[in-house]
Amino acid sequence: MTEFELKLEIPAHRLEPLLAALKKGDTQRQRLRATYFDTHDGALAGKGIVVRMRKEGRKWVQTAKAPGKGPLARLEHDAAVGADTAGTMPAVELMRHGGTPVGDAIRRALGLRSGAEFPPLVRLYETDVTRLSQTVRYGESEVEIALDEGRILAGTRTVPVRELELELKHGRPEDAVQLARQGCGIHGLWLSTISKSMKGQRLAGTAAAPVRGAQAAVYGRHAGGHALVTAVVAACLEPVLTRASEVAAGSSAADDIHQLRVGIRRLRTALRELASLTDGIDPAWEAPLVETFRALGQHRDHGHLARTVEPQIEAAGGPAVDTAALDADVPDPGSVVRAPAFQDCLMALLAFSCREPDQPGRGHDSTRKRVRKALAKLHGQVLQAGAGFASLDEVKQHQVRKRLKRLRYLTEFAAPLFDARKTQDFADSIRPLQDALGLYNDELMALHAYRALAPAHAKAWFAVGWFSARGAPHALACQHAVVVFSRIRPFWD
C-alpha cells in the first residue's frame, strides 16, 4: 500500500503542552521497540528502503518501506510474524514481502531476479519509543495522530525522539495537511522528512540514500492547467522539503542552504508564471518565501566570501582580510527555516499540490498557449535588456539574471508540452549566459562586501580595487553571451 504521512518535529519545551492537548481526546498508549536491518554493504538504505522488526504490545510485526511518489508518500508492507511467546525477536525474512511493490523494490535494490535467494541481513540500530495516538475525523478524512517520545540507539550512542506523525487512514491528503497546519501554528512544530530510520543510519554511521535533486514534473502531454500546476508545484516542493528538513535540524552545510534557495526560487517561478492556469494559488505565499530566500542568501554570500573569494584575492597577491565582521548580522539558518510563517507556507503549498480543482481549470489548448506566451515574454525581456547589459545599472542587470533563471525553470516545467529534444537543446543553451551572469553577480556582491569592510579594515581596499577593475570586462562578457544566446531558436515557435 502507499502511505501518506506527515512528520513534525517537536521542540523540547513544547512536548508537555502537546502531550496535555493530545490526552484530552480518546488516546491509546503503546510502547514500540524496533530493530532495523540491512545488508552488510547497506544496499537497502542506499535505495531509501527500510526493513524493521517491531514489537507492538505482545505482537511482532515485520515492516518494509520504500520511496513513493514525493517526499511524503511511502510504499509500505506489514507482515504479522506472530505473538511474543519465547521472549526473543523472530528472524527477519525478506521473503515475507514477496509479491508486493515493496518486495519488488527490495529485489531491484539488491539486484536479484525473481526467485533468487535473499542475502543475510545485519542488525544496525534500534528505536524505543512510547506512542500516544488517537484517530480523528477532519474534513472528509480520517487521520491518525501519533506522538512518539523515546530514543534511537546504535551501540553506545543515542539520540532523542520527539515527533508528531499524522497518517492519513482514509480520505484526502490535503485534510491531513490542514490538520498539521493547526499543530504547527499552535505548538511551533516544523515539517521534517528525516525519518527515524534516517536518524538511525546517521547515528550508526551506515550508508543512506543520496539526497535527490530537483526532479522533472510528471504530467501528461495533453494535461490541463490544474494538473500541470499541481504536478510542477509538487516537484518543486520535494527538494525544498528535503533541504529545509536538514537545515531545520541544524545543518549549515553550504550545499543544503544553496539547494534550498534554488528550490525556493524554482517554486516562486512556478507560482508566478503559472498562476493563470488554475485557481487556488494564494499571493500571500510569496512573502514568506522571499523572506526565507533572502535570509538564507546572506548566509550563502558570506560563506562564499570565506570559501571562494578570499582565497582568490590572496592568490592575486592581495592581503588576507578577516571577513568575520560581516557575520554579525547573518541570521541562524535553522531559525529562519523553522519560522512559523515559512512552515505554514510549506504546509499550504503541500495542501495545494494535493488538492482537486474547484473548477476544471484551463484546458490543454489554452494551457499550452498561455505557457508559450509566458516563455516568449521572458525570452523577449532577457534579450531586449541584455543587449545593452554593460550600460544598465545594477538593479536592471540583476533583473536580467532573475528573468533568465525564470526562463530556464519555466522551460523545464513546460518540457512535457513540447518536443523533448528541442526543449533540452534550448535549456542547455541557457547555461553559458547563466554562468556569465552568475560570475558577474558574485563579484559584484564581493565588491560591495569589501567596500563595506574597507573603512575599518584597510586591507580590504585591495579587493575593492581588484573587483572594480574586473567589473566592466565581465559586464561586456555578459552582454556578448546575450548576443550568442539570441541566435538560439526558441523551442516553442
Feature annotation, model-predicted:
Residues 1-493:
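Function-determining surface determinants
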